[in-house]
Amino acid sequence: MDMNELKLMQNYPLELKVMKTKMRIQEWVDYYGEDGVYVSFSGGKDSTVLLHIVRSMYPNIEAVFSNTGLEFPEIVEFVKSFDNVTIIKPEKSFKRVITEEGYPVVSKAVSNAVRYAKKNEEEGKDTLRLRQLRGLEKGSKFNKAKWGFLLDAPFKVSDACCEELKKKPMKKYHKETGKVPFIATMAAEGGVRK
């Protein structure tokens, strides 16, 4: 799908969006089976809407919530108010992740760029990413002095937080159960999601 197709679909009326969503849900369940799928549920608006649509068709489909320990108590209570929700937890705590890997700052993309540029710099490698963060290359969203200072920050910078606290527990759940997720991701939210 290209950006023009995406823009066209974003302008569909709500009824058509819901209909297309239900068609995709049906196809997913037809392929994997009702017992072979689950809804990845964060308690946020996107996954709550997805859970509602999925369960309007298949009331018994499981939801899985990764409790990172960083959620507001109200979100955890909201998640627990739904039936058939499995709560999983990461192996590492947030404190351990930031101590071992570094802090997530600015965005996942910037944190990732800083993490690997710093690693390459420490290894004596001159990479494009490093030059971009140092402001020596043009044509990059990271080619800004405001991000370059993070290379010299007195703390580690990393995008590992989301991977360790959310993605790894979900991958482990998939490996243990063989189930595949429905994931609610809005294209309008950030460059990574487009």
What are these regions (language model features)?
Residues D2-K194:
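ATP-dependent adenylation/nucleotidyltransferase module used to activate substrates
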